[in-house]
Amino acid sequence: MNTPEDSTLGREVAYPSGYDPSLLFPIPRAAGREAIGLTGALPFTGRDRWHAYELSWLDAHGKPCVATATLHVPHDSPALIESKSLKLYLNSLNATRFNSAEAVRTRIVTDLSTRAGADVSVEFGLPPIDGVGDGESIDALDVSIDDYGPPNAAYLTAQAQPVVEEVLTSALLKSNCPVTGQPDWASVTLHYRGAPIEREGLLRYLVSFRDHAEFHEQCVERIFHDVLLRCAPEWLVVEARYTRRGGLDINPLRSSLSVPAPLSVFRDLRQ
């Protein structure tokens, strides 16, 4: 079984000179989910949306082509794709000739689906940047914080008040790569219906990820799991928009609804 320590993270590697799908490094989701307490049927649906900013190949005549792309990896794929390996794989296309852009897209779909163990979708282009986004930010709350990890779900409570439907956001989520220790920065959105979540506690909880080491996808699943257990909303959608590294950013979304609530699809200003 592949582990994060087996990947190219934190290692000096040569950039590929030709197309090489073996560069893609899948990491089973099961171990990360077991650490959270997700051992049975998953309480969510969702996807990991990747934005690729550095995609290039050669056309049939050898002329370079450039593009951006949006990739969707389903939440129930047996494996996630380690980000540095995806960067190296996409770079392996740089000197490869294709007859059409569609041939490139099809090749990426096939390779990613094989490694993830589920159908991955790929489309050219990126969502628009939105400087406002959905919801109400909790970042201006006047709170004292001195707990930066590990994540502390005890901060999460729901108020004994009538049910609301609201979207709460924070740009203060930070976690760290579990292999290299590099910081991962994100804006996070919670859309839910239920008793009002106590906002100061939610902010303290999100900040308690600051020294925590876990992959992006696992952080979002941990947030979803903790909020669902501690606050018991009728339904919940959690999405994080991580900042770019190596020409890629990751945007995991988890929802308790079979069809996720209509959060807008956009890129954050920091992306």
UniProtKB/Swiss-Prot annotation:
Q: Which UniProt keywords apply?
A: Cytoplasm, NADP, Oxidoreductase, Queuosine biosynthesis
Question: Biological process (GO) annotations?
Answer: queuosine biosynthetic process; tRNA modification
Q: Which top-level group of life is the source organism from?
A: Bacteria
Molecular functions per Gene Ontology: preQ1 synthase activity
This enzyme's EC code(s):
1.7.1.13
Pathway listed for it is: tRNA modification; tRNA-queuosine biosynthesis
The record ties this protein, via Pfam families, to: QueF, QueF_N
Which residues participate in substrate binding? Answer: I81, E82, S83, H216, E217
Which residues are catalytic? C177, D184
Q: What class of enzyme is it?
A: oxidoreductase
Q: Where does NADPH bind?
A: S83, K84, R245, G246
Q: Which InterPro entries match?
A: GTP-CH-I_C/QueF, NADPH_dep_7-cyano-7-deazaG_red, QueF, QueF_N, QueF_type2
GO cellular component, alphabetical, reads: cytoplasm
Q: Its family?
A: Belongs to the GTP cyclohydrolase I family. QueF type 2 subfamily.
Task: Please name the PANTHER family in this protein's record.
Answer: NADPH-DEPENDENT 7-CYANO-7-DEAZAGUANINE REDUCTASE
Designated name of the protein: NADPH-dependent 7-cyano-7-deazaguanine reductase
